């Protein structure tokens, strides 16, 4: 996947917005104002195609053991975030999409019932 495919997949999810809250190169995807994915555009330009995604702690451990391209989240809470190297030889596009959906769903499930209702009504 290239950055445009990642971006298109993320923004196609219900209630997702994209931002640059930290600087002009850190692209952040939020659902209902909560981050579920972020990446450095500089890294993509330099061939380091990485994205940070939220992940269930138990699943994080399993994924890190199984895939060379999945590591503890860089500059993130290592228990709840993974850095996924999208162009790693052991990471398929389908797996990237699956992990984006997992991250999105984790964040949505953590929203208050009121905000979940607002999201459903979009």
Model-derived features: positions:
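Charge-dense, helix-prone N-terminal extensions
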Residues: 1-122
């Amino acid at each position: 996947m290239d950055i445009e495919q990642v971006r298109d997949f993320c923004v196609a999810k219900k209630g997702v917005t994209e931002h640059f809250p930290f600087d002009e190169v850190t692209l952040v995807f939020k659902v209902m104002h909560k981050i579920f994915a972020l990446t450095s555009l500089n890294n993509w330009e330099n061939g380091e195609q990485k994205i940070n995604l939220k992940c269930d702690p138990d699943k994080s451990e399993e994924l890190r053991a199984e895939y060379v391209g999945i590591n503890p989240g860089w500059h993130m809470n290592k228990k709840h975030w993974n850095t996924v190297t999208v162009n790693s030889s052991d990471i398929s596009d389908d797996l990237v999409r699956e992990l984006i959906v997992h991250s999105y769903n984790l964040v949505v499930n953590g929203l208050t019932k009121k905000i979940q209702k607002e999201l459903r009504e979009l």
